[in-house]
């Protein structure tokens, strides 16, 4: 096990720098109180990088990430850069190249409802009464978003058409399936694979390989759902699911659905991993430029993203559990930021960071 870690910190735009400051408080505690040894180096990314260095992903930033064991990412984008050509906007010109460069093929999106925040869910109270804790695993580098040929054409009779190609290679499905089963072993030992194998050849291959991989994990129960049924079942009874294994397009849809039924995207972290478990860890929400600089953003998603880095990037489950426990502790005590408060008595961004940090120090 590594004893020295290097973390590249990329705060980015909008609320990114604000919530990242609260993650720094947790990093300081990990170093001083838990005696973890790591080096932290901060780099520009996104719109601020365009403004200061001319590129959304400067070479210096990419090189710094290459020398690191993990990337802790904030958020990118904002109205200032919305009139740029789409390929040059921070969201496209920073995050997608990072995913491609490091071959981050697996996106992990936890969707958990806390008992203290059940009232925020758009689902009926009897559905969320028992809570839910779903881990959506989305294949991130294959499928219809990357398949070729893809384009638009104009026929001689002036009829325009567009086309995309859904392609999956066996090795792409194999590696994401193994990861899903391995993660399920540390949870509730259930994997539900999402496909459309009654129509799509790519889904038939997906289902066949997932079934084959499942034989290596006899302690994990495997089920299959068509994407249309899965979307309905998540609304009807989310508590029946543990790990959802999804192709790229279906995972894009499912992970957002799982996020919205929790009631606040400001609570949700994510991780994108490659085969060596190198990862990029970031909040599931965006840069929220409308509230940037107001000190009202919820830092919990950024702190929980750091927890995922500790869990998967450092393989320190016990310490990650303590970070998660500190977040739960402050919620149980009634501390809220504006987005999860039902009144005007809420904490500022820095105040929420402080109470979580104090809970981590005290072991609450």
Swiss-Prot record:
It is found in: Cytoplasm. It comes from the Bacteria. SUPFAM superfamilies: Isocitrate/Isopropylmalate dehydrogenase-like (SSF53659). Mg(2+) binds at residues 228, 252, 256. Pfam families: Iso_dh. Pathway: Amino-acid biosynthesis; L-leucine biosynthesis; L-leucine from 3-methyl-2-oxobutanoate: step 3/4. It catalyses: (2R,3S)-3-isopropylmalate + NAD(+) = 4-methyl-2-oxopentanoate + CO2 + NADH. Keywords: Amino-acid biosynthesis, Branched-chain amino acid biosynthesis, Cytoplasm, Leucine biosynthesis, Magnesium, Manganese, Metal-binding, NAD, Oxidoreductase, Plasmid. GO terms for cellular component: cytosol. InterPro entries: IsoCit/isopropylmalate_DH_CS, IsoPropMal-DH-like_dom, Isopropylmalate_DH. NAD(+) binds at residues 78-91, 286-298. Binds 1 Mg(2+) or Mn(2+) ion per subunit. Its EC number is 1.1.1.85. The record marks 145, 196 as: Important for catalysis. Its cofactor is Mg(2+); Mn(2+). One of its GO terms (biological process) is L-leucine biosynthetic process. Substrate binds at residues 99, 109, 138, 228. One of its GO terms (molecular function) is magnesium ion binding. The keyword Cytoplasm applies. Belongs to the isocitrate and isopropylmalate dehydrogenases family. LeuB type 1 subfamily. Catalyzes the oxidation of 3-carboxy-2-hydroxy-4-methylpentanoate (3-isopropylmalate) to 3-carboxy-4-methyl-2-oxopentanoate. The product decarboxylates to 4-methyl-2 oxopentanoate. Homodimer. NCBIfam families: leuB. This is 3-isopropylmalate dehydrogenase. It comes from Buchnera aphidicola subsp. Uroleucon obscurum.
């Amino acid at each position: 096990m590594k004893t020295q870690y290097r973390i590249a910190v990329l705060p980015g735009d909008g609320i990114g720098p604000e919530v990242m400051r609260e993650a720094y408080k947790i990093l300081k505690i990990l170093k001083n109180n838990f005696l973890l040894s790591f080096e932290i180096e901060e780099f520009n990314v996104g719109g601020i990088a365009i403004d200061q260095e001319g590129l959304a992903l400067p070479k210096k930033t990419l090189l710094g990430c290459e020398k690191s064991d993990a990337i802790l990412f904030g958020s990118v984008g904002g109205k200032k850069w919305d009139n740029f050509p789409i390929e040059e906007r921070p969201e496209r010109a920073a995050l997608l190249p990072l995913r491609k460069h490091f071959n981050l093929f697996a996106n992990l999106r936890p969707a958990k409802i806390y008992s203290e925040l059940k009232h925020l869910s758009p689902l009926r109270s009897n559905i969320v009464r028992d809570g839910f804790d779903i881990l959506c695993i989305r294949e991130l580098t294959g499928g219809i978003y990357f398949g070729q040929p893809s384009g638009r054409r104009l026929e001689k009779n002036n009829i325009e058409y567009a086309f995309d190609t859904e392609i999956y290679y066996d090795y792409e499905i194999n590696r994401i399936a193994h990861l899903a089963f391995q993660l399920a072993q540390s949870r509730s030992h259930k994997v539900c694979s999402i496909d459309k194998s009654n129509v799509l050849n790519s889904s038939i291959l997906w289902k066949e390989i997932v079934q084959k991989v499942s034989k290596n994990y006899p302690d994990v129960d495997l089920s299959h759902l068509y994407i249309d049924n899965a979307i309905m079942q998540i609304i009807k009874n989310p508590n029946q699911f543990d790990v959802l294994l999804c192709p790229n397009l279906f995972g894009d849809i499912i992970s957002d659905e799982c996020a919205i039924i929790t009631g606040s995207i400001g609570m949700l972290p994510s991780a994108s991993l490659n085969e060596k478990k190198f990862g990029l860890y970031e909040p599931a929400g965006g840069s929220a430029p409308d509230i940037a600089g107001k000190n009202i953003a919820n830092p919990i998603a950024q702190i929980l993203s750091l927890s995922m880095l500790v869990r998967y990037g450092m393989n320190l489950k016990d310490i990650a559990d303590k970070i998660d426990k500190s977040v739960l502790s402050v919620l149980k005590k009634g501390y809220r930021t504006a987005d999860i408060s039902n009144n005007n008595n809420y904490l500022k961004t820095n105040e929420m960071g402080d109470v979580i940090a104090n809970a981590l120090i005290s072991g609450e």
